[in-house]
Amino acid sequence: HKLQERYDLLLEDLPIIKPYQDKDSYSALHLYPIKIQVNKVKNTKKEIFEALRKNGISVSVHYIPVHTQPYYENIGFKKGCYPNAESYYQRSISIPLYFGLTLEQQDKVIESLKQVLQ
């Protein structure tokens, strides 16, 4: 949880919404998804994602709305059916958080985010 707490502290001033963590519960914290405040940044999510990847940061996408998958589109689901799921997807990426992530690696993630979001 030290890495998560460090992200919480060091990402404080960035135009993102950090994951909610209930103080009375315990989580495995296998992901650290952030929501980009797209109205406060100049780059698109795709540009941010690609810039981070180019800088060697293993960002991921979580979660693609199920109703936009080909199977569900073939049985009648359409984009716009679940606007909250689509909005979350359009603004969210997961930054590295895993056992073995070093402070130096985490610093690189943080610095890369600061560069691409400001």
Residue positions per predicted region:
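PLP-dependent aminotransferase class I/II
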Residues: 1-118
